[in-house]
């Protein structure tokens, strides 16, 4: 299998971000490479399977594909019209079913297409290659037969998923066999390895160690997930080193493998950034938001599907901002636009009163200059207004304050009982998420009748309580606590009377309700400094002594960035969300505004993979730390879950049997 030579790793060459490399490989290395000889000026058919069509859609637009000479996109398993004068590009998984369909298309006297350029998404077996070579009628019609080694969804400029939506159930559930769990991990390992094959990176592989791995202790399959995944990835990388031309032979980056047990609170706590709140509160389908546009003629309002994604500059600027900050910036943008328009100024003077954001929105829409740019601005003003209404209607400020106080040890059981007894307007989901956080910090409070009493007080169903009880399957903060100094686990603050599972980071409290931070933030910073304890996070390979030399760049960057962030306060900022003080220049989102910073001076990449689903707050952390550490931090996971999705998945879990070391196969 051939593989083109492109220097995209962080150890040399022009630096491009993760999604950019993915996109360029698909468009140029695959689609454009099929433009050979006499076929240069002709249109082609692109044939994909259910997985590869998603890979393509996450990385490229249809216009990009068309520009590379593709006039038609087809599903390999659907009946297709013969186009014998056209060439076909196959981007498919290397499965027996796909190969059979390909041979059916191209064999015999009347093939569907003139020539076939075949690109497999991951390594293909010798058996399947042999199966293709056996058909003598097909061989002359093959223009290329290659491994792209690209089998992941690039969901963000610094994020990918392996499309294992049921990983939590398959790996943490009781009903699933260890064989099914192993199969899931094997595919996962192969797909993660294609990330490194694509970027031409060879990582130092570190992973969360099993909590008790000795001859006298029983351990569970779920506790060995990072260990087994690390071994699987390592095996795949060893093959890539031998088969891929110019693949690095020494470490060029770092990979840290974790699972959802590392932080059970991040998936359910209310996150207050614009991006997270949109996906949490607006019932969006993926990144699609249904925008209702009032009719200018007084008729029925128009419904329009819009995508909230990186191509939208306003979304890109605001997605990691606190909702109060985002609302304020949108108001400022609208005001600035109107200040440049004389007709709008006259209208404002006639009314005499201060204009609300909604008034500004209506005025802008009535202006003759109303354009696509203002349409985008109006869209985000509407979204922010809707979010702020929901925050008020659902009493999320009070709930959010209690959640964060619980996490930081400033509140306890009495405060939760008081809240459940007095806040009758609180939503069912809000109370459920509160109890899930409580169960992580105080698991003993849900034993026996105690759990039943809390369920009655919160007026939750037994189905809801299944999610609460299943938090224990991910390991509670209490169970995870280790006595070793510098350990990775959730630690208690001895200075507080109540139990705390996060240490205060004063620089993080730029806005109220933004104290919480995901555990991976602390882990990534320790990894970058070389301070992760080896007993908790062993390494599959011992990197060369010079490997950590690149981290000196990150420490220099840290010292040069220690400037206080500018306060965004004004008379319009709600009192509940006002900034609480200065920070280190990274906190609120001053760094995130410049997330598309110059990558050319970046150090070695850091990859973090979380089995069991990642959160938007964790993705935000990776953007933030990339600028702080001067190293591109890429988050991978089995899926990207918003709180409702995570709760649904958690309800599917049941207790798992213990696994003896004799049964362990790594």
Curated annotation (Swiss-Prot):
- Coiled-coil annotation reads 340-377
Q: Where is the composition biased (Low complexity)?
A: 550-568
The UniProt entry's GO CC annotations, sorted and at most eight, read:
cytoskeleton; cytosol; extrinsic component of membrane; phragmoplast; plant-type vacuole
- What membrane topology is annotated for this entry? Peripheral membrane protein
Q: Where is this region: Disordered?
A: 534-589
Which domain of life does the UniProt lineage start with? Eukaryota
Q: Per the UniProt record, which residue ranges are transmembrane?
A: none
Q: Which UniProt keywords apply?
A: Cell cycle, Cell division, Coiled coil, Cytoplasm, Cytoskeleton, Membrane, Protein transport, Transport
Q: Name one GO biological process term.
A: cytokinesis by cell plate formation
Please give the family membership noted in the entry.
Belongs to the STXBP/unc-18/SEC1 family.
Q: Which PANTHER family match?
A: VESICLE PROTEIN SORTING-ASSOCIATED
Assembly, in brief, is: Binds the syntaxin KNOLLE. Interacts with SEC6.
Could you tell me what this protein is called? SNARE-interacting protein KEULE
Q: What is the lineage of its organism?
A: Eukaryota, Viridiplantae, Streptophyta, Embryophyta, Tracheophyta
The gene coding this protein: KEU
């Amino acid at each position: 299998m051939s593989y083109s030579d492109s220097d995209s790793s962080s150890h040399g060459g022009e630096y491009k971000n993760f999604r950019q490399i993915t996109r360029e490989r698909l468009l140029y290395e695959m689609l454009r490479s099929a433009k050979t000889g006499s076929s240069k000026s002709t249109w082609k058919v692109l044939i994909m399977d259910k997985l590869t069509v998603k890979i393509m859609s996450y990385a490229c637009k249809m216009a990009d594909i068309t520009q590379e000479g593709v006039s038609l996109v087809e599903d390999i398993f659907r009946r297709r019209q013969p186009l014998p004068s056209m060439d076909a590009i196959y981007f498919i998984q290397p499965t027996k079913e796909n190969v059979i369909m390909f041979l059916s298309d191209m064999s015999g006297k009347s093939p569907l297409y003139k020539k076939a350029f075949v690109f497999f998404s991951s390594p293909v077996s010798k058996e399947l290659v042999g199966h293709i070579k056996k058909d003598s009628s097909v061989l002359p019609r093959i223009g290329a037969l290659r491994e792209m080694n690209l089998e992941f969804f690039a969901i963000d400029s610094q994020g990918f998923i392996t499309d294992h939506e049921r990983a939590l159930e398959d790996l943490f559930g009781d009903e699933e066999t260890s064989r099914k769990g192993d199969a899931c991990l094997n595919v996962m390992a192969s797909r993660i390895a294609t990330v490194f094959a694509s970027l031409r990176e060879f990582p130092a592989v570190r992973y969360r160690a099993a909590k008790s791995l000795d001859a006298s202790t029983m351990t569970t399959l779920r506790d060995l997930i990072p260990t087994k995944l690390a071994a699987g990835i390592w095996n795949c990388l060893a093959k890539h080193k031998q088969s891929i031309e110019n693949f690095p032979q020494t470490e060029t980056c770092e990979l840290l493998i974790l699972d959802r047990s590392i932080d059970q609170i991040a998936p359910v706590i209310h996150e207050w950034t614009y991006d997270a709140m949109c996906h949490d509160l607006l019932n969006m389908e993926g990144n699609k938001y249904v925008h209702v546009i009032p009719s200018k003629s007084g008729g029925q309002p128009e419904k329009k599907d819009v995508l909230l994604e990186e191509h939208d500059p306003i979304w890109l600027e605001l997605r990691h901002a606190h909702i109060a900050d985002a609302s304020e910036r949108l108001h400022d943008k609208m005001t600035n636009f109107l200040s440049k328009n004389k007709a709008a100024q006259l209208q404002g003077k006639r009314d005499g009163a201060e204009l609300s954001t909604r008034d500004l929105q209506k005025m802008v829409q009535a202006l003759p200059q109303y354009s696509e740019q203002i349409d985008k601005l109006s869209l985000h003003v509407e979204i922010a207004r809707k979010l702020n209404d929901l925050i008020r209607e659902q009493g999320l400020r009070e709930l959010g304050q209690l959640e964060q106080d619980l996490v930081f040890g400033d509140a306890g059981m009495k405060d939760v009982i008081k809240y459940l007894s007095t806040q009758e307007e609180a939503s069912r989901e809000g109370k459920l998420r509160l109890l899930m956080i409580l169960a992580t910090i105080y698991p003993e409070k849900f034993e026996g009748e105690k759990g039943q009493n809390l369920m009655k007080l919160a007026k939750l169903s037994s189905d809801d309580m299944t999610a609460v009880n299943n938090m224990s399957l991910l390991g509670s903060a209490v169970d995870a606590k280790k006595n070793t100094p510098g350990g990775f686990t959730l630690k208690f603050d001895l200075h507080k009377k109540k139990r705390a599972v996060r240490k205060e980071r004063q620089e993080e409290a730029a806005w109220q309700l933004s104290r919480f931070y995901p555990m991976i933030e602390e882990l990534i910073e320790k990894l970058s400094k070389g301070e992760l304890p080896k007993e908790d996070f062993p390494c599959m390979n011992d990197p060369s002594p010079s490997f950590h030399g690149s981290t000196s760049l990150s420490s220099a960057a840290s010292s040069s960035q220690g400037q206080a962030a500018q306060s965004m306060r004004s008379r319009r900022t709600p009192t509940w969300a006002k900034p609480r003080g200065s920070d280190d220049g990274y906190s609120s989102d001053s760094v995130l505004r410049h997330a598309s910073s110059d990558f050319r001076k970046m150090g070695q990449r850091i990859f973090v993979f979380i089995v069991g689903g990642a959160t938007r707050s964790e993705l935000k952390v990776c953007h933030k730390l990339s600028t702080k550490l001067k190293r591109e931090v890429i988050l991978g996971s089995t899926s990207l879950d918003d709180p409702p999705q995570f709760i649904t998945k958690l309800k599917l879990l049941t207790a798992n049997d213990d696994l003896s070391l004799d049964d362990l196969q790594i």
